[in-house]
């Protein structure tokens, strides 16, 4: 830990006046996930109206001015009520978390993946000023059908993003947070201050520093279960055409994307895109590199430059995929001035695109269900249903 008197932690609640002061917080901020921050505060009012706090926007400030996490308060509780001071617990989440509370059965027709994502967001009041797509370079054809069966809107949104290789992150300021989608590494912002590796001093003030960074190796890490995706015509798009049982090698010849033997039509270009993104996702899952820092400004989805690490290959740019924040300020209780902050990091090489891991699968429909269409319904007859529905 480092004592940093320049990073006080504050919580500003929209349209609400209180004497609540933050004594500690912890929170996990990860790429392609919904963040959650647990905040402990003290106040002199033992009868604080907790219902009045729910659904209010709030900004948890830590680090430099205007740096922090914005969200909405989804939980509020009184942990201890004393004669002179009371302890409260608040939970801060993004507006996107609302999608986790609606589970339904529905069929979406003739929508691209970005169109489906926008429709899900707007159904929960997340309008265009609170979400955007940037640096979108891929092909996203319309899906004839996309089935939502007993899964939440959030699960469906994350599943579609995982299937298409679209990542999302959050941008924060004191007034709001914005949900940002992209499929290109160019969309990741670069952290302005590089992280210099330095061993922790036993005492005294310490500037923003990378305290630890190392790779975790495992015998079982990266072992994957083979999955064969069947295309609409019943053929596996990545299977060698001329492969024979018992042949010494069944690899297709490699052709650069820009060569004459490259994609000749839309379907072939789409297959190459899916294959490339699957390979990128596998590469992202192969290595497990973690670190620790007292740098309060680190957020998931940022590119961080590492300097002065004793292992030279770590001195490079890294994509932060997960940041586990923890902080406390004991001077609120004791009249002292220690500010302990810690961020546990998980990173990828800058060249990786941060493709989301395929951790969410569509629900299995095991019974016949009736449905009604409010408008014109176009039925699709084919021998195989697309596995990405």
Regions found by a protein language model. Give the residues of each.
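Amphipathic alpha-helical and helix-coil boundary elements used as assembly
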Residues: 1-389
